[in-house]
């Protein structure tokens, strides 16, 4: 059963000593966003993030990082929400970054993908939660170098 939380996953890789971030275009509404999805049953946040990344891109990453960036989303957006009595109005969206080395093989949830530098990704992303998470990842990577 769908768990009452959402995960947002930003894969990144280094090309010519610069960070590139993977964003994908959703088939259902055409927006550019990070990889995302809901937890299932008793999955941990990290288990859900790894599963979503694999299901939607066939990627396996390393250096997983749970970010400080998170937001709350209206639960009415998600099927089965009437079972989530402990969350009467909203559910949390937890964000992750993950380092990858390969290109994705997209599931049918997406029509296209791009490896973007920070500025291009910020301009293409539709949702504030995605832009906030990407800002945090970019800051973490910049400060680590």
Q: Model-predicted segments: where are they?
A:
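Short connector loops at helix/strand junctions that flank enzyme active sites
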Residues: 4, 34, 89-93
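Residue-level signal for short segments within beta-strands and strand-turn junctions
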Residues: 11-13, 25, 99-100
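Generic C-terminal helix-cap and adjacent flexible tail
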Residues: 139-145
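Active-site-adjacent beta-strand/loop module that shapes the phosphate/pyrophosphate-binding cleft
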Residues: 70-104
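Conserved Nudix-box catalytic region and its N-terminal flanking loop in Nudix hydrolases
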Residues: 18-62
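A short coil-to-beta-strand element that immediately follows conserved catalytic motifs
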Residues: 60-72
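Conserved N-terminal beta-strand and adjoining loop/helix that marks the start
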Residues: 1-21, 41
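NUDIX/MutT-family hydrolases
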Residues: 93-135
